[in-house]
Regions:
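ATP-dependent carboxylate/acyl-activation modules
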Residues: 1-133
Length: 133
């Protein structure tokens, strides 16, 4: 199975730019190899921060954006599994993240999507999860 992003769907009104898409693909590949609950923040095909092994996604997101610091502005964020609540997206947005990739499929996907849309961000759904427990 080769995941190149061709089958991903855009859940938001705004589609990613070419640079954002490259960063989303890079972050997704990194998240795939990190212990769950994995969150990766990346920009210019460089990992800026990661959160892993936490009991929930929002704690992983907090770790990732803290490591990225000010460089998170305009960055991409990848989650190795679905984002069950909008809090993970809100943490990313609060630190300047403007592009998200996640499997999708959460009961509350519409809330996460609306949060990203409201901030002018883009969000892609892969349809594939990567758990490393």
């Amino acid at each position: 199975l080769v995941e190149d992003g061709d089958a991903w769907t855009c859940a938001t009104a705004r589609k990613p730019t070419d640079d954002e898409l490259a960063d989303l693909k890079f972050a997704w590949k990194c998240a795939k190899l990190i212990k769950s609950n994995a969150i990766v923040v990346a920009k210019n095909r460089t990992m800026l921060g990661m959160g892993a092994g936490q009991p929930n996604r929002v704690n992983s997101a907090r770790l990732a954006v803290a490591q990225a610091g000010a460089a998170a502005e305009g960055a991409a964020l990848a989650s190795d599994a679905l984002v069950p609540f909008l809090d993970t997206i809100a943490v990313g947005l609060a630190h300047g993240v403007r592009a998200f990739v996640q499997p999708g499929g959460a009961v509350r996907d519409d809330e996460s999507t609306a949060t990203a849309d409201g901030a002018g961000a883009t969000m892609l759904h892969t349809g594939v999860r990567h758990f490393r427990h």
